[in-house]
Structures are given as structure tokens and as C-alpha cells.
Amino acid sequence: MGRSAPMLESEVEALRVVAKEKLPRMLAAAAERTGLHYRRVTVRKTHSRWGSCTREGNISLSLYLATLPDELIDYVCVHELCHTVHPNHSADFHAFVNHHLGGKEKTLAAKLRTYHPGRKRKEG
């Protein structure tokens, strides 16, 4: 598989419009399904991570998350929501995430590692 190319700024701006509508909606659906709560959500142009959660329950999602398959967007949303209960990456945290993902955390995490924020994925 070849290296992925960075997105053009025009592509990023078009993606921002989609992401600001889609990602908060998917986070809200994941929160409803899991019974977990967050304070607010922001969508940012971050290259180093797909999402983050503060101790206050504020969740930030990378706009590049909107380029992923819905099952991976849901995985990141559930992962960040679980940080509202476990603000770390302990064994308890991962067990909690895995519970809310029907035992698929490791599979989804492995799939997510094949993508990189802000890069176009080369098929192949």
C-alpha cells in the first residue's frame, strides 16, 4: 500500500461543513445508546488524534473523523464518551468501551489504526 497524500485545503473546507453536521449527531446517538453523557462537543481540524475528552466532559472530535466509515466514527464517539467515566486508558476503561461496543473494541481499534487524520487513504 502506498503512502497517503494530504488533503487539499478546499477538500478540508468542504469536509468541515459535513463534519460539523454529522459528528455531533453521531456523538448524540452514541450517548443516547450507551446512556453516557457529555457536556459539549466541538469539531476541530486536528491531525494528531481523532478525538479527546476533558475531565469536565467536553468532547473534541477531529473533522477528519467524518472521512471514516460510520462504524469507526461510532467507535471513536463511544471511546470518548467512556472517558467521561474513566478519564484514562486503564484496563477498566477498555473493558467499559468493549462492553459498549459489543466486544468489538480491539477489532475496531485495529481498523482505526489503518487511517490517519488529514490524509487521503490510498486504496490498495
What is each model feature region?
Residues 80:
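Walker B catalytic acidic pair
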